[in-house]
Amino acid sequence: MPSVLWVLFDGGADRPVGRKTPFYVAFKPTIDYLSSLGSCGMLDPISPGIRPGSDTAHLALFGYDPYKYYTGRGAFEALGADVALKPGDVAFRTNLATVDEAGVVIDRRAGRYIAPEEARSVEEVINKIGEEIGKKYGVDVFYKSTVEHRGVLVIRGPVSHRVSDTDPHRVGAKILRSEPLERSKEAALTAEVVNEITLRFMEISKELEINKARRLQGKLPINAILLRGGGYMPQIEPIREKYNIRAAAIAGVALIRGVARAVGMDVYTAPGLGGTKDDVFDQAVKLAVELMSKYDVVFLHVKGTDSTSHDGDFNGKVSVIERLDKALAPYLDKLLNNYFVVTSDHATPVSVKEHTGEPVPILLYGPDVVQDDVSKFSELTCWRGALGRIRGIDVMPILGSYLGLTEKFGE
């Protein structure tokens, strides 16, 4: 029985720069060859004009209405970081950042490329702060670094996810004060804990040895922690029950691992797949192809296209696409006998450096999929494809139909 290999370029879609996009420019003979044999189209991750987060977009792409199932990013980050959440826990996505003396954000990612040993050092400091503050407020606080500047912070106790972010989401703005979004003791307490952690880390970070070393190296100091997306674990029907599909995900980023795990996918990682722009894809693709004999759908997440987009790095984005395509090439014969999907979860134009709301290109190849006249996978060409314009939430039912796994609606 055939299966599906689904490659997703996070933030891969773009706007033209000089009338060309990274997908258009990239030398990707394997993906383009399969495009010439399959059906292409455009996909609205959620709906036209909506700027998706990676969390809500992946929920939709996995076949779950984000307006029904989304309860905040933090819980998915925690799940993907192997943090066991209990009922009532509130989890936040965090960024290690750089601010000036007035608390104005200079860089929301502290230069982005934070070494693992630096991240571990900061993790120890924040957990020590959390222990002290937790005792004061009668809660437990736990922080875990994930990849580069990213991390997750969990508060356990009489708390609420109904508090505002401290992350202003832009450079040049001051760190925000968390405020309760409902009139409850739990929300008020949670906001107090968040604000105290924020202030304490800013104070202590001035004397951290890693920051002294970073300054000597000409790097930005890690002197702030930004919190956003406070949430709790939603109750989600497993994908095997909802779509009769056995699914696996390969990802190096905690958020995507968490969303996949939340919907009941088996989650894997691979050597070289760390969720950065420098990822090496050979082992990840090899694993994906091997897993196709065990699962109906194997999902492979590529983070580097989003990271380079946020950095405004056009050529870097092209390089990520080309490296993934090169890793696919040895398995072309295998792909020709199965189904193959390529798309993005959202556009992150290098000219904007943020998520935007336009549709993204999608390719569906299979031995029995209609062949249209699109021969190159890009935002500029897939409009002509036979798939037309679909939504993210349509993808899983379409795959289930081709695999013969979905039930008929009606008689």
From Swiss-Prot:
Catalytic activity from the UniProt record: (2R)-2-phosphoglycerate = (2R)-3-phosphoglycerate
SUPFAM superfamilies in the record: Alkaline phosphatase-like
Domain of life: Archaea
The protein's Enzyme Commission number: 5.4.2.12
Database matches in InterPro entries: Alkaline_phosphatase_core_sf (IPR017850), ApgAM_prokaryotes (IPR023665), Metalloenzyme (IPR006124), Pglycerate_mutase_ApgM (IPR004456), Pglycerate_mutase_ApgM_sf (IPR042253)
Top class in the EC scheme: isomerase
Keywords assigned by UniProt, alphabetized: Glycolysis, Isomerase
An example Gene Ontology biological process: glycolytic process
Record-level Gene Ontology MF annotations: metal ion binding; phosphoglycerate mutase activity
Pathways involved: Carbohydrate degradation; glycolysis; pyruvate from D-glyceraldehyde 3-phosphate: step 3/5
Gene3D superfamilies the record matches: Alkaline Phosphatase, subunit A (3.40.720.10), Metalloenzyme domain (3.30.70.2130)
One Pfam entry name: Metalloenzyme
CDD domains associated with the record: iPGM_like
HAMAP family for this protein: ApgM_A
Family of this protein: Belongs to the BPG-independent phosphoglycerate mutase family. A-PGAM subfamily.
Function (record text): Catalyzes the interconversion of 2-phosphoglycerate and 3-phosphoglycerate.
PANTHER family membership: COFACTOR-INDEPENDENT PHOSPHOGLYCERATE MUTASE, METALLOENZYME DOMAIN-CONTAINING PROTEIN
Name under which the protein is recorded: 2,3-bisphosphoglycerate-independent phosphoglycerate mutase
Species assigned in the record: Pyrobaculum aerophilum (strain ATCC 51768 / DSM 7523 / JCM 9630 / CIP 104966 / NBRC 100827 / IM2)
